From Swiss-Prot:
Keyword Cell inner membrane tagged: yes
Keywords attached to this entry: Cell inner membrane, Cell membrane, Electron transport, Membrane, Oxidoreductase, Respiratory chain, Transmembrane, Transmembrane helix, Transport
GO cellular component assignments: plasma membrane
Protein name (Swiss-Prot/TrEMBL): 14 kDa peptide of ubiquinol-cytochrome c2 oxidoreductase complex
Transmembrane segments: 85-102
General function of this protein: Component of the ubiquinol-cytochrome c reductase complex (complex III or cytochrome b-c1 complex), which is a respiratory chain that generates an electrochemical potential coupled to ATP synthesis.
Cellular location(s): Cell inner membrane
Topology versus the membrane: Single-pass membrane protein
Gene source species: Cereibacter sphaeroides (Rhodobacter sphaeroides)
Top-level taxon in the UniProt lineage: Bacteria
């Protein structure tokens, strides 16, 4: 009887295939040249960080002036693009309103639903 289990590659074969594909397409070089990997290697090889992590972190904490400057720069960036942000927000609001109107079929939504008729008939 034929078995599909024989066709399943082993873990080592899968690893080798993936490694070959990464090499073939140049992803390994891109990964090794990425900022994330370079920064990780730099931190792993930092002797001061290995000896005293608390002092290492404390030295790199930004001062109040640096935090204030960053906050000011961020605010200026947002202020610079305020018209674009306003346009995006108003467009999103308009899209939500139109979606509500078209999905319910009226402006009220549930007022014309079957369980709550908008026309009230007198009881006889």
């Amino acid at each position: 009887m034929f078995s599909f289990i024989d066709d399943i590659p082993s873990f080592e074969q899968i690893k080798a295939r993936v490694r070959d594909d990464l090499r073939k397409h140049g992803w390994e070089k891109r990964w090794n040249d990425s900022r994330l990997v370079q920064k990780s290697r730099e931190l792993l090889n930092d002797e001061e960080l290995k000896i005293d992590p608390a002092t290492w972190i404390w030295k790199r904490m930004p001062s109040r002036e640096e935090v204030a400057a960053r906050r000011q720069r961020d605010f200026e960036t947002v202020w610079k693009y305020r018209y674009r942000l306003g346009g995006f927000a108003s467009g999103a609001l308009l899209a939500l309103a139109l979606a509500g109107i078209f999905s319910t079929g009226n402006f009220g939504g549930s007022s014309d639903a079957g369980n709550r008729p908008s026309v009230v008939y007198p009881i006889e």
